[in-house]
Amino acid sequence: MTQRSIAGPICNLKFVTLLVALSSELPFLGAGVQLQDNGYNGLLIAINPQVPENQNLISNIKEMITEASFYLFNATKRRVFFRNIKILIPATWKANNNSKIKQESYEKANVIVTDWYGAHGDDPYTLQYRGCGKEGKYIHFTPNFLLNDNLTAGYGSRGRVFVHEWAHLRWGVFDEYNNDKPFYINGQNQIKVTRCSSDITGIFVCEKGPCPQENCIISKLFKEGCTFIYNSTQNATASIMFMQSLSSVVEFCNASTHNQEAPNLQNQMCSLRSAWDVITDSADFHHSFPMNGTELPPPPTFSLVQAGDKVVCLVLDVSSKMAEADRLLQLQQAAEFYLMQIVEIHTFVGIASFDSKGEIRAQLHQINSNDDRKLLVSYLPTTVSAKTDISICSGLKKGFEVVEKLNGKAYGSVMILVTSGDDKLLGNCLPTVLSSGSTIHSIALGSSAAPNLEELSRLTGGLKFFVPDISNSNSMIDAFSRISSGTGDIFQQHIQLESTGENVKPHHQLKNTVTVDNTVGNDTMFLVTWQASGPPEIILFDPDGRKYYTNNFITNLTFRTASLWIPGTAKPGHWTYTLNNTHHSLQALKVTVTSRASNSAVPPATVEAFVERDSLHFPHPVMIYANVKQGFYPILNATVTATVEPETGDPVTLRLLDDGAGADVIKNDGIYSRYFFSFAANGRYSLKVHVNHSPSISTPAHSIPGSHAMYVPGYTANGNIQMNAPRKSVGRNEEERKWGFSRVSSGGSFSVLGVPAGPHPDVFPPCKIIDLEAVKVEEELTLSWTAPGEDFDQGQATSYEIRMSKSLQNIQDDFNNAILVNTSKRNPQQAGIREIFTFSPQISTNGPEHQPNGETHESHRIYVAIRAMDRNSLQSAVSNIAQAPLFIPPNSDPVPARDYLILKGVLTAMGLIGIICLIIVVTHHTLSRKKRADKKENGTKLL
């Protein structure tokens, strides 16, 4: 065993021990929302810089969370409440003695407050991109939702809405309503409303008012325009995930109240489990118990934090390791690019370096012009030292000294740490790092970088990157491109349009086209880098055919970069570049193109790449995601490709999909996903995503994705229908996309351990089928689903196993003993292809079916599930359970449900009351006429 392999585990053990010792600090330093003693600490709510200043927003947020805390406490049976909340005030608002931020930023917020950019909707929603029981990304409220009290009529009180969304975000449960399928036929052949619980009552309403249920039915389906209006007064106490606006609703659907037959997303995504079952299975509930007594918890405490000056320090490794594999050259090129193009104006920037000791190279300098940028570039290192040992802690110490010169503390500052060496004493400065209030972004170069380097980023909420020693990799520049101010102001941040590199032979060329769409174009820059002594021949064509040559670029021969800034707004369209290698040997030529938004009212299309977990153990796959959107609207049908670079070996490319199958949970939400499991060896992997958008194919969605709080159109109260104001349109105007667009984003890095050396047996099964659907046509049942692969969502599975039952509980609890459907003639197709399979279920489902409890009842529904098998007999998990009505004779109409019987009784009673009232009125009128006649007659007699 080598000295390094012995020292590594010892160092890691010391590092872990130190982390445990400092664990009390973690809830407040980069660890996100933590549950301690039944209370949530660290919830971060951030207001976007584009939101106009309004102090009522802050007071309403406080009221919302305070109400939500008590509502959540009771709904979870005295389990959890909100204790400490931070509200991040944008720097664009006036400073009111708010605390200075530490590691908080808009991009890390659990809740964001911002408009939808051009839309008029106010739906609160949570972006969920993972499966059942998994945390979401963020909750989104519009300022209007938080300020306009009229909206509470449709959504319910803001505190109740927040609890609905919190359950999405924290516990990964889904909505129990379905606007697309508001009605269904249950197992007793009754027409039911999609809801949870089934005890919630109301009446059917046609386009012109109340109507009998049968007027809503055409061919046993509900007529378009027929809806169900809920009673404002209910006895049902569930469910928060259905209609939190009802005053009686105070809990989540549990095993006794959950409606397993309703065609909603909760049933589909969570295999018919109740919301409460999923919630109680969460880590929060495994580590907490109900509070004793009857007292309520204390109300939440709020702290307002606000960003000040943006402060960045580059902390750069200059040890002898940086001389290997052109690492210093790559660092110089990327750092120059960052200083000249990426870092935002008015930012304070300093530079420190380190080998075995630290050194300050440049004190803080505010960027107000290009001259300021050039001055900072001049301080970048040009040589490496002869020292092989490094001290990352010494470098960080100098970095803190630099940033503390401004305000005496490092609060809110950013460190960009770049290193290729191992530091076994890295844990020594961990307390200083944790207490600094600084965010550390780490960039590891090559395979010898400190194995614990990423912990600095993880604990401070920073990003993690890896740059392999591959000559044509552009990962270093991609990493610096990904690092933004974190303010959430997309109009001030750069957008990466292109990033590519190739090893080009002598007298050969690198040629490609990049699209500048009409949402970007300001501050557009083309960057070319090379390895040889002189630049390649550069030819660039704009969309009008104008040519730019090498002499039009600003060249830095020391760093081997050539940059071209397009004045004003770059012309939209296709820009074509050609790089000719005029050198006598092969060299890596690379191109990077960035731009900024061209219109402050129109957000640019963006892509954010990330992984589900950044550290895992073989054979667990990596889930790769790319969120492609414009503003908050998803962009559909784009071509999204992930490139994964290992420490050793060739890069792997993978097409990401938004098809609602395999790794992709929700179809057409703009989040493209895929499993990655092609692990070459243990170590770090770098991720980058390319997006290409064809105007003839790709389209922006017309609605915001995510799990939305239900907007109730109206209620019935005392026999009267009271309609709410129509829900505002959440659609968007279609914009001309003549050229499409291209985008690039680094997804950071991830690491994998436990990868076997050499060939290993197949350990990857087909992925779970999550989109099984069943449709009954006459006497046949047609199933459809997306084909899984031989390995997860790639390749081709070997066989399918389809089973069915008339008992939901049977197929849910005992799939292996449900009725087997003959699929011998059905061979799986390639992963991603839509499968369709039709069969007749009658021969196996005649007569009543015995239930697990020994009872029997006649069921009019069939439940079906499926799993796939690969050639090595590895099985997927059982799919979601699909359901459909059995064959119903023509004279067997659906039985009116209780809601209709209630309505019929009400209408009958109202009719009887009306008849009685009519009799009374007629009798009264007759008697009155008779009295008047008698008086007239008596008067005549007196005269």
Curated annotation (Swiss-Prot):
<keyword id="KW-0378">Hydrolase</keyword>
<dbReference type="Pfam" id="PF08434">
    <property type="entry name" value="CLCA"/>
</dbReference>
<keyword id="KW-0106">Calcium</keyword>
<feature type="topological domain" description="Cytoplasmic">
    <location>
        <begin position="923"/>
        <end position="943"/>
    </location>
</feature>
<dbReference type="InterPro" id="IPR036465">
    <property type="entry name" value="vWFA_dom_sf"/>
</dbReference>
<dbReference type="GO" id="GO:0005829">
    <property type="term" value="C:cytosol"/>
</dbReference>
<feature type="glycosylation site" description="N-linked (GlcNAc...) asparagine">
    <location>
        <position position="522"/>
    </location>
</feature>
<protein>
    <recommendedName>
        <fullName>Calcium-activated chloride channel regulator 2</fullName>
        <ecNumber>3.4.-.-</ecNumber>
    </recommendedName>
</protein>
<dbReference type="InterPro" id="IPR004727">
    <property type="entry name" value="CLCA_chordata"/>
</dbReference>
<keyword id="KW-0479">Metal-binding</keyword>
<dbReference type="InterPro" id="IPR051266">
    <property type="entry name" value="CLCR"/>
</dbReference>
<dbReference type="GO" id="GO:0004222">
    <property type="term" value="F:metalloendopeptidase activity"/>
</dbReference>
<keyword id="KW-1133">Transmembrane helix</keyword>
<feature type="signal peptide">
    <location>
        <begin position="1"/>
        <end position="31"/>
    </location>
</feature>
<dbReference type="GO" id="GO:0030054">
    <property type="term" value="C:cell junction"/>
</dbReference>
<feature type="region of interest" description="Metalloprotease domain">
    <location>
        <begin position="54"/>
        <end position="205"/>
    </location>
</feature>
<feature type="binding site">
    <location>
        <position position="168"/>
    </location>
    <ligand>
        <name>Zn(2+)</name>
    </ligand>
</feature>
<feature type="binding site">
    <location>
        <position position="164"/>
    </location>
    <ligand>
        <name>Zn(2+)</name>
    </ligand>
</feature>
<dbReference type="GO" id="GO:0005576">
    <property type="term" value="C:extracellular region"/>
</dbReference>
<feature type="glycosylation site" description="N-linked (GlcNAc...) asparagine">
    <location>
        <position position="74"/>
    </location>
</feature>
<feature type="glycosylation site" description="N-linked (GlcNAc...) asparagine">
    <location>
        <position position="231"/>
    </location>
</feature>
<feature type="glycosylation site" description="N-linked (GlcNAc...) asparagine">
    <location>
        <position position="150"/>
    </location>
</feature>
<feature type="domain" description="VWFA">
    <location>
        <begin position="311"/>
        <end position="483"/>
    </location>
</feature>
<feature type="transmembrane region" description="Helical">
    <location>
        <begin position="902"/>
        <end position="922"/>
    </location>
</feature>
<keyword id="KW-0868">Chloride</keyword>
<dbReference type="GO" id="GO:0070161">
    <property type="term" value="C:anchoring junction"/>
</dbReference>
<dbReference type="GO" id="GO:0034220">
    <property type="term" value="P:monoatomic ion transmembrane transport"/>
</dbReference>
<dbReference type="GO" id="GO:0005229">
    <property type="term" value="F:intracellularly calcium-gated chloride channel activity"/>
</dbReference>
<keyword id="KW-0813">Transport</keyword>
<keyword id="KW-0732">Signal</keyword>
<feature type="binding site">
    <location>
        <position position="175"/>
    </location>
    <ligand>
        <name>Zn(2+)</name>
    </ligand>
</feature>
<dbReference type="GO" id="GO:0009925">
    <property type="term" value="C:basal plasma membrane"/>
</dbReference>
<dbReference type="GO" id="GO:0007155">
    <property type="term" value="P:cell adhesion"/>
</dbReference>
<keyword id="KW-0482">Metalloprotease</keyword>
<keyword id="KW-0862">Zinc</keyword>
<dbReference type="GO" id="GO:0005886">
    <property type="term" value="C:plasma membrane"/>
</dbReference>
<feature type="topological domain" description="Extracellular">
    <location>
        <begin position="32"/>
        <end position="901"/>
    </location>
</feature>
<dbReference type="GO" id="GO:0006508">
    <property type="term" value="P:proteolysis"/>
</dbReference>
<comment type="function">
    <text>Plays a role in modulating chloride current across the plasma membrane in a calcium-dependent manner, and cell adhesion. Involved in basal cell adhesion and/or stratification of squamous epithelia. May act as a tumor suppressor in breast and colorectal cancer. Plays a key role for cell adhesion in the beginning stages of lung metastasis via the binding to ITGB4.</text>
</comment>
<dbReference type="InterPro" id="IPR013642">
    <property type="entry name" value="CLCA_N"/>
</dbReference>
<keyword id="KW-0325">Glycoprotein</keyword>
<dbReference type="InterPro" id="IPR002035">
    <property type="entry name" value="VWF_A"/>
</dbReference>
